[in-house]
């Protein structure tokens, strides 16, 4: 068997692809800064660049900044140091698999990032002096960053879609689990890999197609299929015990250099969700009891982030408070706020406060009702507050108190949780972590008005609980900021 081992090209994991993209984007941003400084120097027609940087970093300038005589964020050298960071923040949504592998979506994302960057700089331009900001330099940076990032991303997509990197997948099992993957493959239009078809021992299924993918044969022909169709990955999509002959064929394929993956792993990669309807109880126990524990260092860092974010959020809240209060008062009268009891980590009860966005009689019968898209109970001011997430700002107080986190599943009412846990499997697993102001489910899915939609949102929540890290928390926060800027909230 060892003589038949294939020499397979080096293939990278999705997380490694994202790391390569991040490093490439950062390098192009740094190169763009250098090119922008050079362009500004040439445009100025004299060697002003070195003088500009030297003046900005001089002891006298630093002393004025430290004494609060000059705001540091309006100083040119600091702006140029921050430009790569700001650009990377604007690109955060381009790391999603369905975007990173698409030239059209990548081009659109870079164009939006450049537009937002130009708009933000235009606002600063109004309040700055000519000597504070090198306007030609910043404009040149946006141009260079857009073109270089686009060029680098197109090269990456071309390499990513090459035969050496593009996986060819064969699904083991044409039952509900396998068909779910096939349906996702067709609906998402992903082309970061090819699903060739199914292998199944059910004679009645052989020769049929499910979601345009054929059942190509039984497991006794697995090795032949692997060679004939240059299969790189086998995805086991069988619920229950794998039969001995099928199991041996899978092991033989692994010895030939084929990667073996379980259905839930590919599902997570494709959707950013956990397939709750295709999991067995022992898998849930392993993933959400044993592996769900994270390091104490992460918990400490997350709490520190919550405290800092809570203070910043409260400052912003106090700034907007009189304006929002006046708008609500004029539009729909009192009260300005409303409060509710929610369940936190470990089912602990606490009270949240939000700006009121619905009519006073939204739940006059006292029965909890789910919010809907274009909900008629939402006021005009409330619609704006929801789209910009400003209605959530009073909850920064809950974050400071430790009842909530900046990032986590949405906090729900006890009566809704009691109802959902009877209909949706593993629903109470959401209570393993603190609820959040924003979260993986909130940025990826809108309103839910049915049990089916609730299940999808739960799949996002459980994915976050399983994979939560500080980089993921930062990604969610940055995408939420983008939602606020674009007014695309729920």
Which residues does each predicted region cover?
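Membrane-cytosol interface motif
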Residues: 110, 114, 165-185, 335-358, ...
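Signature of alpha-helical transmembrane segments in polytopic membrane proteins
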Residues: 1-165, 193, 490
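A hydrophobic, helix-centered structural microdomain
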Residues: 297-362, 398, 470, 475-490
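C-terminal terminal-structure detector
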Residues: 57, 401, 415, 422-490
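A short, structured surface patch at a secondary-structure boundary
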Residues: 371-434, 476-484
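Short, glycine-rich, amphipathic interfacial segments at transmembrane boundaries or analogous
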Residues: 203-206, 267-280, 284, 338-380, ...
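Hydrophobic alpha-helical transmembrane segments in multi-pass membrane proteins
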Residues: 29, 33, 113-122, 310, ...
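N-terminal hydrophobic signal-anchor/signal peptide
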Residues: 1-28, 32, 100-105, 151-318
């Amino acid at each position: 068997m060892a003589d038949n081992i294939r020499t397979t090209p080096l293939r990278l994991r999705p997380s490694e692809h994202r790391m390569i993209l991040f490093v490439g984007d950062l390098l192009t941003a740094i190169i763009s800064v250098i090119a922008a400084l050079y362009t500004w120097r040439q445009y100025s027609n004299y060697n002003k660049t070195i003088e500009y940087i030297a003046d900005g970093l001089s002891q006298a300038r630093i002393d004025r900044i430290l004494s609060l005589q000059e705001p540091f964020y309006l100083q040119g050298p600091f702006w140029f140091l921050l430009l790569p960071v700001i650009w990377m923040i604007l690109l955060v949504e381009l790391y999603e698999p369905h975007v990173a592998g698409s030239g059209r979506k990548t081009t659109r994302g870079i164009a939006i990032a450049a537009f937002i960057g130009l708009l933000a700089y235009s606002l600063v331009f109004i309040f700055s002096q000519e000597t504070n900001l090198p306007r030609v330099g910043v404009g040149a940076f946006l141009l260079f960053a857009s073109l270089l990032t686009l060029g680098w991303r197109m090269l990456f997509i071309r390499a990513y879609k090459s035969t050496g990197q593009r996986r060819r997948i064969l699904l083991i099992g044409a039952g509900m689990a396998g068909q779910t993957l096939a349906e996702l493959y067709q609906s998402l239009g992903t082309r970061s890999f090819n699903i060739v078809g199914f292998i199944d021992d059910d004679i009645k299924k052989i020769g049929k197609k499910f979601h345009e993918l054929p059942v190509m044969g039984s497991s006794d022909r697995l090795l032949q299929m692997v060679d004939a169709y240059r299969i790189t990955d086998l995805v086991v999509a069988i619920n229950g015990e794998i039969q001995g002959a099928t199991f041996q064929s899978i092991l033989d394929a692994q010895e030939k250099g084929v990667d073996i993956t379980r259905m839930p792993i590919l599902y997570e990669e494709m959707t950013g969700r956990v397939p709750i309807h295709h999991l067995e109880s022992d898998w849930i126990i392993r993933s959400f009891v044993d592996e769900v524990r994270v390091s104490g260092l992460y918990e400490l860092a997350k709490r520190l982030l919550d405290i800092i974010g809570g203070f910043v959020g409260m400052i912003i809240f106090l700034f907007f408070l009189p304006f929002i209060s006046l708008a609500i008062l004029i539009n729909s009268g009192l009260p300005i706020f409303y409060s509710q009891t929610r369940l936190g980590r470990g089912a602990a009860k606490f009270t949240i406060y939000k700006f009121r966005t619905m009519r006073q009689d939204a739940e006059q019968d006292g029965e909890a009702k789910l919010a809907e898209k274009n909900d008629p109970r939402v006021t005009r001011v409330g619609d704006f507050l929801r789209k910009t997430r400003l209605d959530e700002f009073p909850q920064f107080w809950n974050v400071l108190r430790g009842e909530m986190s900046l990032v986590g599943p949405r906090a729900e009412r006890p009566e809704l949780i009691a109802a959902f846990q009877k209909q949706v499997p593993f629903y109470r697993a959401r209570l393993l972590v603190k609820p959040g102001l924003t979260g993986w489910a909130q940025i990826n899915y809108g309103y839910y008005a049915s049990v089916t939609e609730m299940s999808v949102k739960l799949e996002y929540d459980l994915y976050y609980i399983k994979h939560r890290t500080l980089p993921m928390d930062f990604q969610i926060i940055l995408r939420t900021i983008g939602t606020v800027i674009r007014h695309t909230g729920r």
